[in-house]
């Protein structure tokens, strides 16, 4: 969801903290957090926004498992004239940049999307070597990766990472069902 489609979507770090605390008080065991640029309302990977959210939730004393996303930074949309060139709608960054906030803030868990799939106007792109790198770094920081899978092929990819020793047992799966294009 976006703030344009749903005015209840929290945008600022303080709104995200408040929403997470409300969810925990209502019975949520886990809060999965993305951050947005408060000025543009667009998704952000700004570590300082994540720090404000993480510290706000932890400082509240609420008993909830913190789950930070690693998803942003894997969205590729080709230009019409040359599909090898990313359009302005793309948001690609290095695997290191995608997990920087996780390594620094060390939530209990973080999402690790084991997927490459089409979305409405872009491809969500996760190269196997990037997944291996991110999973090793995440676990070395003491964070449990939540393996997000959207179809049976993604389960096979996750199992391969487990068999090859890139994901420690027991794995923690999140089955994302009812998602368009996945």
For every predicted segment, state its role:
Residues 13, 17, 28-40, 65-67:
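Histidine-centered catalytic micro-motifs
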């Amino acid at each position: 969801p976006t703030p344009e489609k749903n005015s209840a979507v929290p945008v600022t770090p303080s709104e995200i903290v408040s929403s997470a605390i409300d969810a925990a008080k209502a019975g949520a065991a886990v809060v999965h957090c993305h951050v947005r640029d408060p000025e543009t309302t667009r998704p952000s990977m700004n570590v300082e926004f994540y720090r404000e959210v993480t510290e706000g939730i932890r400082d509240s004393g609420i008993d909830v498992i913190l789950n930070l996303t690693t998803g942003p930074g894997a969205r590729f949309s080709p230009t019409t004239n040359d599909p090898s060139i990313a359009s302005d709608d793309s948001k690609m960054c290095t695997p290191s940049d995608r997990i920087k906030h996780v390594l620094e803030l060390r939530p209990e868990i973080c999402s690790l999307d084991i997927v490459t799939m089409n979305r409405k106007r872009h491809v969500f792109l996760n190269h196997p070597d990037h997944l291996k790198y991110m999973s090793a770094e995440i676990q070395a920081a003491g964070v449990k990766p939540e393996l997000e899978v959207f179809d049976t092929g993604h389960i096979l990819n996750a199992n391969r990472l487990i068999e090859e020793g890139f994901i420690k047992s027991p794995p923690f799966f999140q089955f994302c069902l009812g998602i368009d294009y996945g």
